[in-house]
Every structure is written in structure tokens, then in C-alpha cells.
Amino acid sequence: MCWHLTVPTAAELDRARELFEQHEPRDLFYRVARDLLERTLAGQSDFTLTEAVAVVLLTWNRRFYIRKDTPAFDAQHVADIDDLLDRHGDALAAYRERSIASLRDDDEPVVESLFDDFDRVLGPVGAAKALHVLAPRFFALWDRPIAEGAGVYLGKRGTNAHLYWRWMLRTRAECLDLGGEAEWGVGLLKRIDELNYCSFTIKVM
């Protein structure tokens, strides 16, 4: 299994941002979800955390919900997401205050357990997107083409937690090599995902 992708350069990240904005209008929904989530957490919105996360899931992960072997986005699915957020609320609140640079070996059991629970409900791509929007400085993003670009092949729901932990370690190394948030600000994980998305998902780089 290959886990190496060349560490991106500043020029590549900047070019990816330009291409991403040209080719991906759905970024609007990411920004809306982030804003809605922050206002919900601050008690400034009538929407719930689940509804804020749903903005991302129903736009960036919509293919998950049209497959025959995955759940519909119905009342039961919303209740399942509510349950995830309730059960893992304390852990998510703690991770929301951290950056991926702070990732430690002793985070592994909690991160893997958290991801496994989300994976079983949302699939491996939806799990990463939901966790990222809930703690955007800490949880790394991926999709299947991006993972496959690194030689990583995602499995069925509930089988990907260790792969995601390894992805977190790999992304932390990338962030540190790039200079971290001190160089790029708090949106560095999103910038890396934009480069991966342009390179492996829509292949415009």
C-alpha cells in the first residue's frame, strides 16, 4: 500500500485554489455549512448541528444517497446523525479547538472509534466530510478518487477507521512540511483537499 503523495508547494496550492473556484460551484455550500454550524454552536441560529452538517452531506456527498446499498436521507437517517453528534459531542468539541498539527499517537483509539461510528452511518467519504465541517482544523478530507491517488482503496462502511487514521498522519506531515497554520492560516486542510480534488477527482491539474 502506497501512502506517499508529493508534498505540495505553495504555488501548487495557489493554482489549485484558482482551478477549484473555476470548476466547483458547490464550495458555496461548504461555506454556508461552516457559517451555519458556527452560528448554531453560538446559539445564534434556529437550525441544529445535524441540519448544518446535512448541507455538506446533501451537496458534497449526494451520490451516497442515490445508491441502492445506502440509506435514504430520511427521518431515521437524521435521527442516526443526531445520535452520532450526541454520543460524540464532548470529543468533537475538544477536537474543534485543535489543529491537525497537534495529532498524537494517543489520539488513535478515539479518532478510529469516532470515525468508525460515522463511517457506519455516512460511509467513509461522508464521515470525513462531516467530521471535517465539525472540526475543520483537525479532521482531514478525502474522497475515493483522492484516496486511490495515494494507493488507498476504501472498503465497505465500518471497515475504514484504520485507513483514516493513517490518512490523518499523512496529512499532518503535509501540513507541517508546508509550514502549518502559521504560514497558511486555519484553512490549510481545506487548501490541501482542493489540490487533491483538482488533481485526482476532477483531474484539472
Please provide the spans of the model-predicted regions.
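An N-terminal alpha-helical hairpin/helix-loop-helix interaction module that forms a charged
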Residues: 1-118, 136-205
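Short hydrophobic alpha-helical segments that form membrane-spanning helices or hydrophobic packing faces
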Residues: 127-133
